[in-house]
A protein has these predicted regions:
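Acidic donor-binding loop of glycosyltransferase active sites
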Residues: 166, 180-193, 202
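Nucleotide-sugar-dependent glycosyltransferase catalytic domains
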Residues: 1-175, 184, 198, 209, ...
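Short glycine/proline-centered loop/turn elements that form peptide/ligand docking sites
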Residues: 193, 204-206, 210-211
Length: 292
């Protein structure tokens, strides 16, 4: 497989722009005898036998892929973005570090929100590169970073950027991605984070680590064209600065923002009372009730 990693898997309808190297380890490369790989294989055998297969996505995100999956399962249902379905409920926003109040003082589309989820943290060298890129670019930022990782930041960074941005151990991600001041989401490209960014109409700078993250990042960059993968796959000061400039300032970034806004509108349409995801969700409930 090694010499074919750059090839696309166009034989799968809807994945014509995805490369072999974008797929998760254990699918077509890596340790195919691992527990994870064997689990994926067993899931692949079981899914066609399922009464229904439901996905946290929406039809218009990738219609060709949705049609392909629908042809392979007894009943295929897109029921997302689930974050938008749940947002219709009255919920108290948790913001213990005052991120949203800080955002109110920033201009529209100017802020970089940075978070890599709860599992992964970039290695020390990349954390330093992110900090250096932020400081040099002067881009306002909200950075969600575990407290134990603060020691990896350049000496004096927090003091020097006190007026430019905030570093917090936790941030209200959904609300930040909906805020008009947010201009870019720097992310690991976990699926929930990608959907939340799509739902907010926010372009992404992607730094995938494992699992489906590379595939998601590839889709963000070349399928939906709502962001870009970090240059050469890892953070460097200069590379990160160039990405921030491209997304927040250059014409390419304006196109990404426009595409992201269109997907946001389609996502909200999907979860409206007569939207496809809402109808599918009701269909899923009926299927579960009938089985019980």
């Amino acid at each position: 497989v090694g010499e074919r990693m750059e090839e696309t898997i166009g034989f799968i309808s809807g994945m014509e722009k995805i490369r072999v190297k974008d797929t998760p380890e254990g699918v077509v490369f890596g340790n195919l005898d691992s527990v994870f790989s064997k689990m994926l294989h067993q899931m692949g055998l079981a899914l066609p036998r399922a009464t229904a297969v439901f996905i946290n996505s929406f039809e218009d995100l990738d219609p060709t892929l949705a049609d392909n999956l629908r042809s392979r399962f007894k009943r295929y249902l897109n029921i997302g973005p689930l974050g938008l379905l749940s947002s219709t409920l009255q919920q108290l926003v948790q913001d213990p570090h005052g991120c949203l109040a800080w955002m109110e003082k920033r201009s529209s589309g100017s802020v970089a929100y940075i978070s890599f989820g709860t599992v992964m943290t970039p290695p020390p060298g990349e954390l330093a590169a992110i900090a250096e890129g932020l400081e040099s670019s002067k881009v306002p930022f909200v950075w969600s970073l575990k407290e134990k990782s603060l020691v990896q930041l350049p000496k004096g960074f927090l003091d020097r950027t006190r007026e430019q941005g905030i570093v917090v151990p936790w941030a209200p991600q959904v609300e930040l991605l909906k805020h008009e001041a947010t201009g870019v989401f720097v992310t690991h490209c976990g699926w929930n984070s990608v959907l939340e960014s799509v739902s907010g109409g926010v372009p992404m700078i992607c730094r995938p680590f494992f699992g489906d993250q590379r595939l998601n990042g590839r889709a963000v960059e070349v399928v939906w064209e709502i962001g870009m993968t970090i240059i050469n796959g890892v953070f460097t000061k200069d590379g990160f600065e160039k990405c921030l400039d491209k997304v927040l300032v250059q014409d390419d970034g304006k196109k990404m923002k426009c595409n992201a806004k269109k997907l946001k509108e389609l996502a909200y349409e999907a979860v409206s009372s007569k939207g496809r995801s809402s109808e599918n969700f009701r269909g899923l409930l009926d299927a579960v009730v009938n089985i019980i």
